[in-house]
Amino acid sequence: MSAGRITAKKLALAGMLTAVAAALSVLERFLPLQAVVPLPGVKLGLANVVTMFALFFLDFRLSAAIVLARCLLGALLGGGPTGLMFSLTGSMLALLVMAALKRGHGRAFSLFGISVAGAAAHNLGQVLVAMALLNDAAVLAYLPALLAAGLITGVLTAAAALPFFGKFSKTGVAGK
């Protein structure tokens, strides 16, 4: 079996993870987070639990496909084209950063460090989209507040993911 081959098990897992990520994205829209954190655009990043999970138990290609499908489904289910630009840019940048840091997992970066860096990358991606849409660099002034929120949400996301990592790695479902 070649290393790049996608098995039926992995494809089925990717499909399930896509459904879970899309459901979490939609669910997150209904959480009244703005009542607790009065910063526009701040979300918990629940779907990033799935992204990290896919990175660790599948591969980069399938993880990217899951992120792309989640963003497209989110746009179709109410996010619209502007929401797609924000979501896709932030999510893909987060995926790239987390994939790069995953190589140092256990040595240089913990799951928490990878998650926080992913949250920061996601926020940076969204600010870059806002700058492009508004044609105004003043949007960068919002980045420190988003990065502070990303620190908190990144830690929460990693804490939510951690119990699943240990249990799932013992099943052998992903072939690792």
Predicted regions and their residues:
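Hydrophobic transmembrane alpha-helices
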Residues: 2-53
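Residue-level signature of transmembrane alpha-helical entry/exit and packing/kink sites
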Residues: 6-17, 44, 48, 63, ...
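Interfacial aromatic-anchored transmembrane helix boundaries in multi-pass membrane proteins
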Residues: 25-44, 69-98, 111, 134-138, ...
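Transmembrane alpha-helical segments of multi-pass membrane transport proteins and ion-pumping complexes
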Residues: 21-26, 52, 75, 91, ...
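Transmembrane-helix signature of polytopic, membrane-embedded enzymes
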Residues: 58-68
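Short helix-perturbing small/polar motifs within transmembrane alpha-helices
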Residues: 14-16, 23, 66, 87-121
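Membrane-embedded alpha-helical hairpins and interfacial helices in multi-pass inner-membrane proteins
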Residues: 38-40, 80, 84-85, 104-176
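Generic transmembrane alpha-helix motif of multi-pass integral membrane proteins
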Residues: 44-60, 97-102
